[in-house]
Amino acid sequence: MKIGIIREGKIPPDARVLLTPEQCKKIEANLPVDILVEPSENRVFEDEEYEKQNVTLSKDMESCKVLMGVKEVPIMNLIPNKTYFFFSHTIKEQVYNRKLLQAILAKNIRLIDYEVLTNERGQRLIAFGRFAGMVGAHNGLWTYGKRTGSFELKRMKDHKDHAEAQAYYKEVKFPPIKIVLTGTGRVGKGAAEVLEDMGIQKVKPKDFLNQTYDHAV
């Protein structure tokens, strides 16, 4: 079976991708599957990184039985009679994607939406989690820095990976601001992880309210 990793077509373009080059190589080595990757200038991994793992690049996805992406696929890019995996944002009857769902039906496409994939206990397999919290905390502080002009911070998407972001945080000097982080679930824990990476001290609620600090807490 051939699986195609499609180029993200939604505007603005998304840099995310379903499988890393190493994951593609591992899947092909252990399963009766061939993976084709559609070239992309916007993907977080360069095309050459897939080629180095002997993963085939191809602009033609017609030969693939299954096509996998992240965001909604533009209607004009939908190939009839295929199985697609992506976040369609149609499950809650979102009006803005009604035409997309109609096109999927008209083209005899089987859509498998990540949003409704669950385990035997009915729990979602793909949902907001650690990485959503990490990106949210980072970009929240990026926004604060932009609005106040008190510090500079690159967007999370401009970092190659988490390790690069961690190294970058050591160069950033945050002003003495107070940050309230609510929630202790997967997203909250991801946000707390980034704040810790940034060197932002965690303090007790009473001290947070009553003490003055010369650094971010």
PLM feature spans:
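An N-terminal-biased, well-structured beta-alpha scaffold segment characteristic
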Residues: 2-103, 107
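Short secondary-structure capping/turn micro-motifs that flank functional sites
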Residues: 43-44, 120-121, 211
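Glycine/serine-rich phosphate-binding loop and adjoining beta1-alpha1 elements at the start
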Residues: 2, 74-177
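Glycine-rich phosphate/diphosphate-binding loop of Rossmann-like nucleotide-binding domains
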Residues: 7-40, 152-217
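Generic structural signal for well-ordered, non-membrane alpha-helical segments
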Residues: 16, 20, 43, 93-97, ...
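Charge-rich, low-complexity amphipathic helices
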Residues: 49-50, 72, 126-127, 133, ...
